[in-house]
């Protein structure tokens, strides 16, 4: 399985639109090579190099298998609580 985004290049910077300096919306994601027997997906977007330790930006589970997750998606599976102690996406916001 491979996850990519058309919003930025691999190993590139995340555009400000998807950070606290911009609209702070989730980027579009494409999922490739999803095994046919997949029942559900889990999404974890974290920053292991954050100054205060690993920072969870986006957590969701029980996501219906799909090949595209649209930009600014709402209601994606069952949301988990991120490091801001809220559900949904919270983009990078370096100090």
List each model region and its residues.
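N-terminus-centered regions that define maturation/targeting leaders and the start
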Residues: 1-95
């Amino acid at each position: 399985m491979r996850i990519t985004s058309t919003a930025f290049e691999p190993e590139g910077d995340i555009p400000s639109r998807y950070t606290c300096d911009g609209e702070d919306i989730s980027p579009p994601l494409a999922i490739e090579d999803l095994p046919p027997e997949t029942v559900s997906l889990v999404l974890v977007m974290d920053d292991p190099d954050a100054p205060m330790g690993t920072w969870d930006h986006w957590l969701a589970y029980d996501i219906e298998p799909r090949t595209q997750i649209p930009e600014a998606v709402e209601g994606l599976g069952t949301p988990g609580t991120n490091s801001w102690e809220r559900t949904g996406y919270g983009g990078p916001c370096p100090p």
